[in-house]
Each structure stands twice: as structure tokens, then as C-alpha cells.
Amino acid sequence: MAKTIEHFDLVGLEEVITPEGLERLVKSLNKYTNHTWDYHISPFPVGTRKYKEYYAYVWKKDRVTFLSSEGFYPDREKLFIREPYGANFQIGKFDFTFVLQHAVYGKSETERRAEAFQLVKVYRYFQDRNKKENDILIGGDFNLSAFDEAFSSLYEDKDQIIYGVDPRIKTTIGMKKMANSYDNIFLSKKYTEEFTGKSGAIDFTNRQYKVMRNKVSDHLPVFIIVNIDRDDD
């Protein structure tokens, strides 16, 4: 995993089961790459009684500045199986709020679509929370393609929200082939003009799907590239 992560300046992580596991990853990054890495983990795990996970971020200290935590989305309506979590960062001149969400999988797409339809509330919460910051990125495993109609409420928002990663790119790893396009990063076309339009996923499988999903991850990391020489807030 460290060999894959080293390609990025800042990485959002989900399905972090223990803080100790994250610490081991950061130690590996510091040992095997030419950069010094730091991390931030959510103060507690979220999920169900049977399964909970942390959200986390890791970054290159010479490239990225961690500004502050925005905390969890206050899910008073119980809309999400795992409340999304946000934190503020700066890379070069570009500062932004990076929100992570790991959506429900559930028993049917109906459950997943119900969460996706409410994602606009998460965007609006973090957008309204910090009056000085307009760049809100929402990344994660949404267990749906960004083409799905359930994201229509997000796309219809006045801030012109778009997906950053082409949904035709499959990001989940099956036993014998790539399976689904579940991972993406949503952002505002209106505000985040720093987005270059370049994005994708790093395929580390070498077609060894079963081995890699068991030893590394069953998801490919997705990414967007932004211009860090400007900030339009």
C-alpha cells in the first residue's frame, strides 16, 4: 500500500480499523519513500454495532499543511450509516476542505441511493460551516457510480457540483477482473477552478486481482490534480 500512496501528496483513507494500523502505514511510508509523512485520524470510529471504522488522512509534510479538523457531519436525521468527516488543508496556495464518506452497501441499491440523494446536505453543511472557504471536496467509496440518478440532487445544487473522476473507470477489484465504479471525488465547478480536469485511478493490480484485493485493497485509489499556484477563495 505504501508504494501506491507515495504517488500522492494527500490521501484520504477509509476502512481504517485501528489507529495502530494507520501508524504502521505511516512508518512504512517514512521508511520506504523519500518523504516525511504525517497523518490525522477521526477522533472515534463510526458505523454499526457490528462494524466500525475510522476516517483518516496521510500527507507529505513538505507539500501539505493540515489546518484544522471540521469534525463529523452532525447526522441528526440518521441519514448515513457512517457520518462523513471533514478536515481543512493547504497545498501551495490552494486551501480546501476535504470530506470523506464511506457509503452504505446494504442489501440493495435502494439503500445506497437513499444515502447518495442526501449527500448534498453534507456538501451544504461543510460549505456553510466555513464562510472563508468555498472549496469543498467530497471523496470516498459511494457504492454507486457517479452516473447514478441518485446524485441528481448534488448535481443540481447552485454551486455546480461535478464528479472529478470519470465514472467509466472501474475502481473496485473483483476476484477475476475490475468490477465497479464506486469511488469518486465531488467538487464545485463554480468555486474549485483550481481543478485541472485531470484525474483517474492508479491500477496497482497487474491483473493479479485476487492477490491484490486480499493483500493490498479491493479498491483502486482515485485522484484529481489541482493547480496549487492559485487560490480563488
What residues fall within each predicted segment?
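Catalytic metal-binding/acid-base residues of hydrolase active sites
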Residues: 16-17, 102-104, 142-145
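Metal-dependent phosphoester-hydrolase catalytic domains
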Residues: 19, 124-134, 144-233
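Structured beta-strand-rich core segments of catalytic domains in phosphoester-bond hydrolases
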Residues: 17-94
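His/acidic metal-ligating clusters that form di-metal
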Residues: 113-139
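Extracytoplasmic/secreted cell-surface and envelope-processing proteins
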Residues: 20-24, 48-51, 67-68, 107-110, ...
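Metal-dependent phosphoester/phosphodiester hydrolase catalytic core
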Residues: 92-117
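Loop/turn elements at helix/coil->beta-strand transitions in domains of secreted/extracellular proteins
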Residues: 6-10, 33-38, 92-97, 131-136, ...
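Stable alpha-helical elements in mature extracytoplasmic
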Residues: 1, 12, 18-25, 54, ...
